[in-house]
Swiss-Prot record:
Spans traversing the lipid bilayer: none
Name of the protein described by the UniProt record: Translation initiation factor 1A
Lineage of source species: Archaea, Methanobacteriati, Methanobacteriota, Methanomada group, Methanococci
Domain of life: Archaea
UniProt xrefs under NCBIfam families: eIF-1A, PRK04012.1-3, PRK04012.1-5
Gene Ontology MF, one: RNA binding
Organism: Methanococcus maripaludis (strain C5 / ATCC BAA-1333)
Family the entry assigns: Belongs to the eIF-1A family.
Gene3D superfamilies, A to Z: Nucleic acid-binding proteins
InterPro entries, A to Z: NA-bd_OB-fold (IPR012340), RNA-binding_domain_S1_IF1 (IPR006196), TIF_eIF-1A (IPR001253), TIF_eIF-1A_CS (IPR018104)
Entry-linked SMART domains: eIF1a
């Protein structure tokens, strides 16, 4: 099957769960010490913390699309990064209209 592409299988993409207060965001700046600046889809700019279990599994870079959960205290200023999307998943989110806030 060299040179041929396998038929596309439906992709399963994790979307933000509103009942768990999850929000989509884009990483704007890496601040160091597991901290990032995230532009969220609700229009707020938050400082995000990358938990250790996520930091060890995947690398997060600027312009990555992520899911964040705002803190209960200081919810307009701080959040935790809980998921990072791959390029194919970002394309799917774009086609389905989840990333309208980025335009």
């Amino acid at each position: 099957m060299r040179g041929q592409q396998a038929p596309q299988q439906p992709t399963r993409v994790r979307t933000p769960r509103e009942n768990e207060n999850e929000v989509l965001g884009v990483i704007e700046q890496m601040l160091g010490a597991s901290r990032v600046r995230v532009r969220c889809m609700d229009g707020k700019l938050r400082m995000g913390r990358i938990p250790g279990k996520l930091k060890r599994k995947i690398w997060v870079r600027e312009d990555d699309v992520v899911i964040v959960t705002p803190w209960e205290v200081q919810s307009d200023e701080k959040c935790d990064v809980i998921w990072r999307y791959t390029k194919g998943q970002v394309d799917w989110l774009n086609r389905k209209g989840y990333l309208e806030f980025m335009r």
